[in-house]
A protein has these predicted regions:
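Short glycine-enriched loop/turn motifs at secondary-structure junctions
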Residues: 19-21, 46, 135
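Short beta-strand-loop/turn "lid" adjacent to the catalytic site in phosphate-handling enzymes
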Residues: 3, 7-28, 51-54, 59-60
Length: 192
């Protein structure tokens, strides 16, 4: 993954960071390492995968060639390289046992952190997922619509209007009580 490649360029060491690796659906939930049975089933060679490294673990120090160019050395630490994992880690919380978050962008992620994964049938039916978090926690979450719709409306209007313009037009609409279920499955694979 891209963050792992940057760490390799800095240190010359190959690892896969846990939070990002967890989003591949190729990690074993129980062991938090690559699931070689799934890889074999999918005919994916296991030798392209590296050891899983937890965030905040030292990867090592800069390669000699980089140290010579910049004139100093520094230790490279694995960050939670999945953007939502970093966002959740940085979010303020008064009580880590009762913590909800909404991380919004093109897509939004609504969830909490839990100590043990939840792979129940009910979770599957509700389309909830378990992604790796900091300190071996799980980000138990649901992907929901974020700004994707308004980004695509803007694009389909050839960027003629700013986001502010679109919001102003929507607020002046005659019928302000139209409800669009932005999480309807029709938006998951649109033609536009």
């Amino acid at each position: 993954m891209t963050p792992d490649y940057f760490n390799f360029l800095l240190t010359g060491k190959k690892f896969n960071e846990y939070t990002n690796a967890s989003t591949t659906q190729l990690l074993n939930l129980k062991t938090s390492v690559w699931d070689y049975d799934i890889l074999k089933l999918l005919n994916i060679p296991k030798d392209i995968f590296q050891t899983i490294l937890q965030p905040s673990t030292s990867i090592g120090y800069l390669k000699h060639s980089i140290k010579e160019k910049i004139g100093f050395d520094l230790e490279v630490i694995a960050a939670p390289s999945h953007d939502t994992a970093s966002a959740v880690l940085s979010a303020p919380s008064y009580d880590e046992n009762y913590f909800l978050y909404l991380s919004s962008g093109t897509w939004s992620l609504l969830g909490t952190e839990i100590d043990n994964y939840n792979s129940s049938l009910k979770s599957l039916e509700l389309n909830l997922t378990n992604e790796g978090g900091y300190n071996r926690k799980y980000r138990y979450l649901k992907n929901i619509m974020g700004l994707w719709i308004v980004q695509n409306i803007k694009k389909e209007l050839n960027d003629k209007y700013s986001f502010k313009d679109l919001c102003d037009m929507a607020s002046k609409a005659n019928n302000k009580y139209i409800i669009i279920d932005v999480n309807d499955e029709v938006f998951l694979s649109p033609n536009s």
